[in-house]
Amino acid sequence: VTGRCHRACWYCPLSRERKGRDVEFANDRRVTSPSDVIEEAESMSALGTGVTGGEPLLVLDRVVELCTLLKEHFGPDHHIHLYTGLAPDEPVLECLRGLVDEIRLHPPHESWPQILETDFARSAVLARRMGFAIGIEVPALPGIGNLAPALPLLDFLNINELEWGETCAAAMRERGLEPEDGLHNAVLGARRWAEELPADQKVHFCSSVFKDSVQLRERLKRIAANTARPFEEVTDDGTIVYGVLEPTGALDGFLESLDEDDYAVCEGRIEMAWWVLVDHGAGLPGKKYVVERYPNGGMVVEVTPLDAAIQD
């Protein structure tokens, strides 16, 4: 709901286009109105919403407006959880009651050794009494075992594997940290730090691989199921694949030979089922290629030229 934040955590992975800026995004889409948020939620048949920042409670009125809209549109069973680096007091919690189902607190790293003496512990007790599900969600950092005394106050303690990011890379290098490998964003040693916490059913660990490979893939698949055009193939990763022809001459009745669901005429190009383009491309004048991208007009993952392959 905003990229603004009152803190400057050295490990914050928020991207440059969001960090420190009062901008709103729904998933990866920049939104400028409440209706944009509803449209994005509907595009993936969302069963719930996570409200994040920056710091959401810096724009409390915005949070209340959006959560009210979501509950009214999708019904009371639409689960809403909110992340915050603040310790909400009773007036703030009262504003959120009936709208936010679950609060995930992010106490600053330096407060962990005295966690029971902080406003976060007091906020957890108050929120639980007011009917919220309440927990702590933080990255795996050295000293995370200091949070164990707070477990009796919480419904959960979520630990995210510390991740390397563009905006926090310099700070991580200064601390002697490095990526686990060249394929993933996990920081070397983060999983070991998480092991400081006792085995407890309230403690949950989310690996970087799970977040990137499972959570993102499932979200993309939900969006693709609702938004893919009839001629687009949905992959196991949730991306969509289609063929593109940029014609430079007459197509001699080619489009008339296709079913209407097999193509779409766009400005300067024709988008179609990739297998149709592969099968018939040799006789068509113009540039031909296959596109793989995130669904609903999302990021392009790969473009494969077909001209040479068709000639071969």
Place the predicted regions along the sequence by residue.
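Short Fe-S-cluster ligation motifs
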Residues: 33-55
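Radical SAM enzyme core and accessory elements
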Residues: 234-312
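Canonical Radical SAM [4Fe-4S] cluster-binding loop centered on the CxxxCxxC motif
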Residues: 1-31
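Short, acidic/turn-prone active-site loops that include or flank metal/cofactor-
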Residues: 107-112, 161-165, 290, 294-296
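Canonical radical SAM enzyme core domain
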Residues: 19-35, 57-98, 102, 106-118, ...
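Acidic (Asp/Glu)-rich catalytic clusters
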Residues: 39-43, 96-99, 124-125, 151-152
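Short, well-ordered coil/turn segments that N-cap beta-strands
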Residues: 45-47, 76-80, 99-101, 130-132, ...
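Conserved C-terminal portion of the radical SAM core fold
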Residues: 119-214, 229-243
